[in-house]
């Protein structure tokens, strides 16, 4: 809506401890969260070196306890992009986490605090912050990451040190593939799920495709998934182009797409860079070609004018304003006055909701206890309604949250609404999570 700034701060954000009523008992064991999925230009994570300490769920710090005892206080920690080009994603997830805390405290006899730290979009910085939150702030589990490279870095360390971690908005298929971990549970859909969501529509739209993608783990796994699906359906990928991320100039890559002659272009570009690529697609006069993006984030297009946003033909989505369900949640986000509701708000909510509920079911924040209560768990919290009512469960074989996904397209400009919050896209079809998730045996995950 007007007055909501779609552009993030560029200054590093300090670590902060927030809550509607912050509990001063800082010794309580807690939860930690990172948010998101765009990239940092780095490669995949390497785990950061294990300490062998098994930090999660101490049980002696006045928070969660072992042995099935009740839990009356938790401290949630969140490492995410709070400055720089991805702050708009990280800060939305923080808002979602705060709303989840409000609901969980109202429903349960539990006090929850939230501690946030800025990843600065750097895997090493993020790992340092996550380690500090666990070892110094004594949080119970970690969640988050906008960047898939950041998420893989933290996931490796969490797996080696028995810390539960929810990579809140990271979509690289590696997180529930070769980079999966005993204590890592992905609440967002994977790239392969989103690629499958739009695969048939892409195949029906054109016989030949040119794919350009952000050159790091998120874009690499997206390109592999989309190309594989197109080729399985007998379509031709005339060429693929890895694009450095982030990049200020997409002109040369758009020129290559134009020169390819392909009637359709897959624009698998991360974060706000997609705005730059879209503007240059228009500048080069190829916006009439079929344009597809497997992972739509509404806020990226809200930074463009409506005419520019209307060029998107095919997109996949985890959730957004166009999705059925969650109307009350969407309005609560809008009432905050910070930004309109979109997928990162939901992912922040889901991560806290599922982490806290797992601790409460287990009576402990011990990583093994949380894993036991999450594996195979069928979700029955308010997030099911927010996602439109479809089945949601934590798959035991790879720790992927199986959930509905959507295909969406841009509305005609005359039908794009701005009140009570922006709705510029429309949902075309809903897919059951089991219909788009690859079989566990094909993921490369071994738990």
Segments from the language model and where they lie:
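Segments of small-molecule ligand-sensing domains
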Residues: 336-345, 356-420
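N-terminal secretory signal peptides
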Residues: 1-17
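Extracytoplasmic "Venus flytrap"
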Residues: 68-96, 117-124, 146-147, 213-220, ...
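Extracellular/periplasmic periplasmic-binding protein-like sensory domains
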Residues: 281-350, 360, 431, 442-446
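N-terminal Sec signal peptide cleavage junction
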Residues: 36-37
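Beta-alpha junction/loop-to-helix N-cap segments that form part of ligand/metal-binding clefts
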Residues: 89-93, 106-178, 187, 275, ...
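Extracellular/periplasmic Venus flytrap/periplasmic-binding protein
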Residues: 173-174, 181-284, 320-324
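Periplasmic-binding protein-like
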Residues: 133-146, 166-168, 210-213, 261-271, ...
């Amino acid at each position: 809506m007007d007055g909501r700034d779609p552009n993030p701060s560029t200054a590093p954000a300090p670590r902060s401890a927030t809550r509607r009523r912050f509990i001063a008992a800082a010794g309580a064991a807690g939860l930690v969260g990172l948010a998101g999925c765009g990239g940092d230009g780095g490669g995949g994570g390497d785990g950061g070196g294990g300490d062998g300490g098994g930090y999660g769920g101490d049980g002696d710090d006045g928070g969660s306890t072992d042995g099935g005892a009740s839990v009356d206080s938790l401290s949630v920690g969140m490492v995410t992009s709070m400055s720089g080009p991805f702050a708009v994603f990280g800060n939305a997830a923080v808002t979602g986490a705060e709303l989840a805390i409000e609901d969980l405290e109202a429903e349960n006899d539990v006090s929850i605090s939230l501690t946030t730290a800025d990843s600065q979009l750097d895997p090493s910085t993020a790992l340092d912050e996550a380690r500090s939150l666990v070892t110094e702030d004594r949080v119970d589990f970690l969640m988050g990451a906008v960047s898939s490279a950041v998420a893989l870095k933290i996931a490796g360390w969490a797996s080696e040190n028995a810390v539960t971690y929810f990579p809140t908005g990271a979509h690289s298929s590696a997180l529930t593939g070769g980079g999966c971990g005993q204590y890592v549970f992905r609440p967002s859909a994977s790239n392969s799920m989103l690629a499958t969501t739009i695969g048939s529509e892409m195949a029906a739209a054109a016989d030949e495709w040119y794919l350009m993608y952000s050159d790091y783990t998120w874009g690499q796994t997206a390109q592999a998934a989309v190309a594989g699906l197109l080729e399985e359906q007998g379509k031709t990928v005339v060429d693929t182009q890895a694009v450095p991320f982030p990049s200020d100039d997409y002109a040369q890559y758009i020129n290559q797409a134009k020169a390819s002659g392909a009637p359709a272009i897959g624009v698998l570009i991360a974060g706000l860079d997609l705005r730059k690529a879209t503007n240059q697609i228009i500048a080069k006069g190829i916006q009439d070609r079929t344009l597809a993006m497997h992972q739509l984030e509404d806020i990226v297009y809200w930074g463009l004018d409506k005419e520019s946003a209307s060029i998107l033909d095919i997109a996949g989505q985890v959730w957004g304003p166009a999705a059925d369900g969650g109307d009350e949640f969407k309005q609560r986000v809008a009432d905050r006055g910070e930004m309109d509701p979109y997928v990162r708000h939901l992912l922040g909510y889901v991560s806290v909701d599922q982490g806290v509920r797992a601790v409460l079911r287990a009576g402990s924040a011990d990583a093994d206890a949380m894993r036991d209560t999450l594996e195979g768990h069928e979700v029955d919290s308010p997030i099911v309604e927010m996602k439109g009512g479809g089945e949601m469960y934590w798959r035991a074989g790879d720790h992927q949250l199986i959930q509905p996904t959507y295909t969406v397209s841009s509305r005609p400009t005359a039908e794009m609404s701005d009140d009570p919050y922006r709705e510029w896209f429309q949902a075309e079809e809903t897919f059951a999570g089991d219909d788009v998730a690859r079989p566990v045996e094909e993921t490369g995950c071994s738990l």
